[in-house]
Amino acid sequence: FLAKKVAKKLVSHVAQKQLE
């Protein structure tokens, strides 16, 4: 199932947005 991969990408994306 891809949920874990997608979740990781989403977390990475959100984390980068919050860092800016």
From Swiss-Prot:
InterPro entries: Cupiennin
Keywords: Amidation, Secreted, Toxin
Keyword match Secreted: yes
GO cellular component entries: extracellular region
Subcellular localization, as worded in the UniProt entry: Secreted
GO biological process: defense response to bacterium
Residue(s) carrying Glutamic acid 1-amide: E20
Highest taxon above the source species: Eukaryota
Pfam families: Cu
GO molecular function: toxin activity
Tissue: Expressed by the venom gland.
Family recorded in the similarity comment: Belongs to the cationic peptide 04 (cupiennin) family. 04 subfamily.
Protein name (database record): Short cationic peptide-4b
